Amino acid sequence: MISPDAARNVVGIIGNVISFGLFLAPVPTFWRICKRKDVEEFKADPYLATLLNCMLWVFYGIPIVHPNSILVVTINGIGLVVEGTYLFIFFLYSPNKKRLRMLAVLGVELVFMLAVILGVLLGAHTHKKRSMIVGILCVFFGSIMYFSPLTIMGKVIKTKSVEYMPFFLSLVCFLNGVCWTAYALIRFDIYVTIPNSLGAIFGAIQLILYACYYRTTPKKTKAAKDVEMPSVISGPGAAATASGGSVVSVTVER
């Protein structure tokens, strides 16, 4: 019989693969930016938000905050590198006004993280308290990002078209939420359960909408639309799961 820890590790590994795939989902968008040497109408906000979430979860997973959570650090460490690369490309091809705004937001995020780190390490002296404080922050920011698909879902209902909501991406986001919710329930972790259960619910709603409206979607044409599909990314840990948010940009042919 498989032990709970072994089952959780298996689910966590599967979740790692899905999460890593979601981190890489915006690659086509940034390939386009590099080819055109212009960010066009794309915004850096989703990637800045994801960067903050990854920083919070990396801090959550280090031994002095939450022991035995190396996988939390690794998946979100990868997320930091990936999001940092996206932001570097975005900065490289942005006009000065957007660059200054990016630097300002990054500065605020770094100051916020420094305040969190100092406050937690100096003000909380047990792993339980430190995990609780950082975990609550991660749940708060992660849950906010889970509500971002509401805009896309509203557009689907209004237009009776799923052209702005790719099926595969909706499915992967749903599986990601289900996987990490299952991971959290094997050995109950409230900090993981809340945001990932929201992700599973919103992913399920997207799939239901797709089933309802895909027949009424206009046939594809040669024009291309750039779509930003919000999703929240999670990574595993020995005793907890890390979550970060990312808005996945894809190109849908109409």
Curated annotation (Swiss-Prot):
GO cellular component: plasma membrane
Ranges per topology, Cytoplasmic: 31-45, 91-101, 153-165, 211-254
GO molecular function: sugar transmembrane transporter activity
Gene3D superfamilies tied to this protein: 1.20.1280.290
Ranges that cross the membrane: 10-30, 46-66, 70-90, 102-122, 132-152, 166-186, 190-210
Stored Pfam families: MtN3_slv (PF03083)
Localization: Cell membrane
Residue intervals annotated with topology Extracellular: 1-9, 67-69, 123-131, 187-189
Signal peptide (UniProt feature, chain positions): none
Record keyword Transcription present: no
Superkingdom of the organism of origin: Eukaryota
Keywords (A to Z) from UniProt: Cell membrane, Membrane, Repeat, Sugar transport, Transmembrane, Transmembrane helix, Transport
Subunit comment: Forms homooligomers and/or heterooligomers.
Protein name in UniProt: Bidirectional sugar transporter SWEET6b
